[in-house]
Amino acid sequence: MSENEDLQKSFLDTVKYDEKGLVPAIVQDHETGKVLMMAWMNHESLLMTLEKKKACYWSRSRQKLWLKGESSGNMQDVHDILIDCDGDTILLKVSQKGGACHVGYHSCFYRKVKETLDMEICDTLMFNPDDVYGKKS
């Protein structure tokens, strides 16, 4: 496919969803390039993200749309949406308000593996999840 033919396809026609109708989305800070999280999107969440310019995902555990930051206030303003060469992974470049991770860190990738295979915290704790989501019994 030539570059011109590739660009004439609609973005929405290019996305290749898996058998469950989902596509992985990598989320990156638009200024620093830091990877913040990975989440799943379906067609509806992708449309909502395009419309609102706020990141919206599909929660596999809750089986419903999930507007990032709706309960915590840690919204993601979407600056750019990119799609990989195969059309089966999306990259969102966002401005993150607060922490991206539900356990309170700026990034979900807050643990670094050391040579000893132990892990160390390598990110900033932004909030206490018990204060934001309430304590789980």
UniProtKB/Swiss-Prot annotation:
Cofactor binding note: Binds 1 Mg(2+) ion per subunit.
Binding site for Mg(2+): 84, 86, 88
Record's catalysed reaction(s): 1-(5-phospho-beta-D-ribosyl)-5'-AMP + H2O = 1-(5-phospho-beta-D-ribosyl)-5-[(5-phospho-beta-D-ribosylamino)methylideneamino]imidazole-4-carboxamide
Residue sites binding Zn(2+) per the record: 85, 101, 108
Keywords: Amino-acid biosynthesis, Cytoplasm, Histidine biosynthesis, Hydrolase, Magnesium, Metal-binding, Zinc
Coiled coil spans: none
GO terms of molecular function: magnesium ion binding; phosphoribosyl-AMP cyclohydrolase activity; zinc ion binding
Gene Ontology cellular-component annotations: cytoplasm
Cysteine-cysteine disulfides: none
Pathway: Amino-acid biosynthesis; L-histidine biosynthesis; L-histidine from 5-phospho-alpha-D-ribose 1-diphosphate: step 3/9
Keyword hit for Metal-binding: yes
Top EC class, one word: hydrolase
Subunit relationships: Homodimer.
Function, as annotated: Catalyzes the hydrolysis of the adenine ring of phosphoribosyl-AMP.
Membership in a protein family: Belongs to the PRA-CH family.
Descriptive protein name: Phosphoribosyl-AMP cyclohydrolase
